[in-house]
């Protein structure tokens, strides 16, 4: 991200990313992938004791927040009507439950003094090996981080000619979401890849068509695909050449009204 200025990327309305969890060699710890065929009788697989990606060992969280603060749009200072959101930007950071306090602290040190926690509920758990031992994890977590004003918020509310909310047009959005898995049309590239369906929900809530969305930890490219399919301008950074190549050749080669191509992202 350090060289982002040379690409002349416009300021983002939304930065959304899944930062490395810093679990290193324990990434597959409770996952059946640790064993051949998912059965410990078969012995350990090639994934046992392996990290999912190289950046999980040396990710600099504070440097990440520093550059994100530079890539976001400036705060919206326009006067607001009562009960309205501003057009201010925000960040969404996926994380583990244990990372929440660390991310909140890091965000405050870089001007993101406010936050909204999000929970994503799954109907399955990857912690199969712990099923007969304890309660297993079936949730994902994220933080919406913002500076001062509440960020742009789109819940379907309509405005009349007098600038007032039209009754019964907006809907309440809860701080929990169903974790909707993607179909076979979305390639599986990254071990912690987030579903395009889930990303689309978030992008629709916090941006408008034509807004800029940036993913600083791009991985599979699923954020870019979700944003592009919704008519947002998408930009991403990825240091792992293998993930970059697969995202370019598999995730981002698709048609949106016959016009979408990888060259739209570079």
Region spans (language model):
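Conserved hydrophobic residues forming the short capping helix/wall of the S-adenosyl-L-methionine
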Residues: 107, 251, 255
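Conserved SAM-binding loop
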Residues: 247-248
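Core catalytic lobe of class I
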Residues: 1-237, 242-244
